[in-house]
């Protein structure tokens, strides 16, 4: 059974210990059977749903367009994110393994944040795509060429990897003033960084990384939707407004699904608020696990091209010359 790391004496610091203790949802490790199957089901359904989206887009040349390319990247980020979460989640559920080596913890942290920021970046790119398609329909093909999309993809890759690869090295050499006990069932950067001493110089860079992605992206996304709303107000035909709005429905739902739990987590993450650890941890699970599960359903239902091709693939093919 895992034990708490040794307490650090007041006014003293130490280097990173060889292990971290993951607390997660209190009480779950004592009765893992009832939440192991839902965890496995969430992972398998997320992988199946996003894998289907990847398969359909890759095999259909008609879907090799900007919006579908960004949807392809979104499914990649969803599969990567849910896969990065599973090792420690299933370790706690199946074996009560709350202790994780520091190196494995930092590696998991990098993958979680790389794919999380990738998802945020792709959602931003998709909002720009929708804004251009609705606000500048005549110029849309000339604005979002294959070359521009390639540059956007490179920018997303640099943003995800360039910003987050230095984090484990910074955290590994920062002085720590608190025991290495993490509040979640997986390793997150804010959870690790809060254990460092206040004067640690890497904290400023860590704050910059968080704000540059998760703080900036939702503002730009909602600015894009402000432009879309302004254009739609000038459309006289109610039917045309409805059609234009429907092209944004799946994306806007995905945006709200991703950012609302994250914003709530930021708002309740204050020691003076009477929020239980169960509530905080459950909201974290919703933020990380629900989008990969729901996004494929949203896009399959709301996007006619995706839905039609999935149904065509599922229908049995007629044999011979049967009509």
From Swiss-Prot:
Residues 55-62, 129-147, 225-244, 302-323 are cytoplasmic. One of its GO terms (cellular component) is plasma membrane. It comes from the Eukaryota. GO terms for molecular function: G protein-coupled receptor activity; olfactory receptor activity. Residues 1-33, 84-107, 169-203, 266-280 are extracellular. It comes from Homo sapiens (Human). Keywords: Cell membrane, Disulfide bond, G-protein coupled receptor, Glycoprotein, Membrane, Olfaction, Receptor, Sensory transduction, Transducer, Transmembrane, Transmembrane helix. The gene is OR51S1. Glycans are attached at residue 11. InterPro entries: GPCR_Rhodpsn (IPR000276), GPCR_Rhodpsn_7TM (IPR017452), Olfact_rcpt (IPR000725), OR51/52/56-like (IPR050402). Gene3D superfamilies: Rhodopsin 7-helix transmembrane proteins (1.20.1070.10). It is found in: Cell membrane. It is a multi-pass membrane protein. Belongs to the G-protein coupled receptor 1 family. Odorant receptor. Disulfide bonds join 105-197. Its main location: membrane. The keyword Glycoprotein applies. This is Olfactory receptor 51S1. The lineage of its organism: Eukaryota, Metazoa, Chordata, Craniata, Vertebrata.
């Amino acid at each position: 059974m895992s034990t708490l790391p040794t307490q650090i004496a007041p006014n003293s610091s130490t280097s990173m210990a060889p292990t971290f203790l993951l607390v997660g949802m209190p009480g779950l490790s004592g009765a893992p059977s009832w939440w192991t199957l839902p965890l496995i089901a969430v992972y398998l359904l997320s992988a199946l749903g996003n894998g289907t989206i990847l398969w359909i887009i890759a095999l259909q040349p008609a879907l090799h367009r900007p919006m579908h390319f960004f949807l392809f990247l979104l499914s990649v980020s969803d599969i990567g994110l849910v896969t990065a979460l599973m090792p420690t989640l299933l370790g706690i559920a199946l074996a009560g393994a709350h202790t994780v080596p520091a190196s494995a913890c930092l590696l998991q942290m990098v993958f979680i944040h790389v794919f999380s920021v990738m998802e945020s970046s792709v959602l931003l790119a998709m909002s720009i795509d929708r804004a251009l398609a609705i606000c500048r329909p005549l110029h849309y093909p000339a604005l979002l060429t294959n070359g521009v999309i390639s540059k956007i993809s490179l920018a997303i890759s640099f943003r995800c990897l360039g910003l987050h690869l230095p984090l484990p090295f910074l955290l590994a050499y920062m002085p720590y003033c608190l025991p290495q006990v993490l509040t979640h069932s997986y390793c997150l950067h804010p959870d690790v960084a809060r254990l460092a001493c206040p004067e640690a110089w890497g904290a400023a860079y860590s704050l910059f990384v968080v704000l540059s992605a998760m703080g900036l992206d939702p503002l730009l996304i909602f600015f894009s939707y402000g432009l879309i709303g302004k254009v739609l107000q000038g459309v006289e035909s109610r039917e045309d407004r409805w059609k234009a709005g429907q092209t944004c429905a799946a994306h806007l739902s995905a945006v709200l699904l991703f950012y609302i739990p994250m914003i709530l987590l930021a708002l309740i993450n204050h020691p003076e608020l009477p929020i239980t650890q169960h509530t905080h941890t459950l909201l974290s699970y919703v933020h990380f696990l629900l989008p990969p599960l729901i996004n494929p359903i949203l896009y399959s239902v709301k996007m006619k091209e995706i839905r039609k091709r999935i149904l065509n693939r599922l229908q049995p093919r007629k044999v011979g010359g049967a009509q």
